[in-house]
Amino acid sequence: MLASNPSDHSERGDLVRGLGLGSAIAIVIGDTIGTGVFLVASDMARAVGSATLVLIAWILGLLIVLLGAFCYAELGAAFPKAGGPYVYLGRGLGPLWGFLFGWMSSFLERPVAMATLAAGFVRFLGFLFPIVATPLFSSHIGGYEFTFTTAQPIATVIVVMVTAVNYFSVRMGGAIQVLLTSLKTGTMLVIVAGGVVFGTKHAGSTAPAITSFSLGTIGALLTALVPAMWAYNGFNDLGDLGEEIVQPQKNIPRAIIFGLLAVGGLYLMANLVYFLVLPFAQVAASPHVASDVVQSLSGSRGAAWLTVAMAVSALGALHVVVLTGARIPYAMARDGLFFGFAERLHPSLRTPTGALVFLGSIAALLALTGTFEELYSLFVFAVWIFFGLVAIALIRLRQKEPNLVRPYRAWGYPWTPLVFLAAAMALTVNLWMVRPVRSSLGLGVIVLGIPFFYRWHKRPRAAGIHCGRN
């Protein structure tokens, strides 16, 4: 009989299974559609210089994350435990790798995602209230210029408020997420419909044509994939709620795959409309592409309403990141592999209050220090290292545990994880070359966790649970 998985504590009843298939799909869509699709088209357009290449980057990104979704669906169904990849990596590659993922997620991925979404929310506010972007002071630290605006403290307050909301029950959180997801998908469909009906009347110019593919073009595509991957990020987070999903062996794979396909379709349609309605140069220069599209179609009043809807969308994604992210340090602390306070649960609501306060505090500090673009580049590099490791863990588990019960098996194995691994390696290497300082910071956070692992791994509780041995 196989040994207990990391974080295999479902018999304790610590967490509540209160999320059905509808809530799970809403979480995937709501977590994935945050601020990215409304904002990053300009970054991608500047990177590749062609509307066609922007769309190709979105399609490539969708294909890559679909391969990853198949991997996460198999592992999530096989190990429906709190912590997601913390469990998969610990079982497939060994306790150190599971721990380093949890460390990276707790100190970098989730706090940065929270801060980025809050910064995106404030960026939408700036469209309605330009005073939000008013510089307060600036300073030079080495070769880096730091500008502090009113946006940073506002983003910090948003992080604190959403973290506080997540003290409430899982079922309530699922219902809220269904509502917010319906609003954001409805908003995107309205943009698409308006662009299809009225877009050709407003298109001012065509984008530069593609004359040939070269190494420079491929490098530009990889650069454009960085913001696209930020926009697609979220499909992988559902597994963190494995102990709170009803019939997880069935519902985790369905929700991940169906949710991601829906997101990809919406993203492609929205970006087609962006370039249909606006001249390419305006898309490349605009910090608020979606708002500019709606303003072109319906005037300033329509753009204002869209901006409010996009701000709500960012809040919805922020809610999911907090909801799912807190389960990772909670699962680690429960296994004796994190700070003990992160194991604390609310006595009646059964929410991981210690982990919530921990993540919220780090995210609030990050929100004070960086802008939207600076934060997501730091985030993507570290996350995609572990995406590649999850693909390796899937292959290793197929080899060393062939009899493991797998309610869902990844389509196209072994090519699915191999191609996903290759894509993850290409993306991280390119990002290191393009943004070496921020990539180095991300890697440094990961490496910093190693001495903590060897300190905590000596605890009796950690030695028996996390190694995955009989």
Where on the chain are the PLM-derived regions?
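Helix-loop-helix connectors at the membrane interface of multi-pass transporters/channels
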Residues: 1-4, 90, 118-150, 187-190, ...
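Membrane-interface "cap" regions at the ends of multi-pass membrane proteins
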Residues: 1-42, 46-51, 65-70, 81-82, ...
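Helix-loop-helix junctions that connect adjacent transmembrane segments
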Residues: 2-3, 8-16, 51-55, 132-150, ...
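Hydrophobic transmembrane alpha-helices that form the core helical bundles
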Residues: 43-46, 66-159, 164-167, 311-331, ...
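TM-loop-TM module centered on a large, flexible mid-protein loop between adjacent transmembrane helices
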Residues: 87-88, 94, 126-136, 212, ...
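Membrane-interface loop-to-helix entry segments
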Residues: 122, 150-201, 215, 256, ...
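C-terminal membrane-solvent junction of multi-pass transporters and transport-like membrane proteins
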Residues: 147-150, 162, 341-353, 387-438
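A generic transmembrane alpha-helix motif of multi-pass inner-membrane proteins
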Residues: 199, 377-383, 412-470
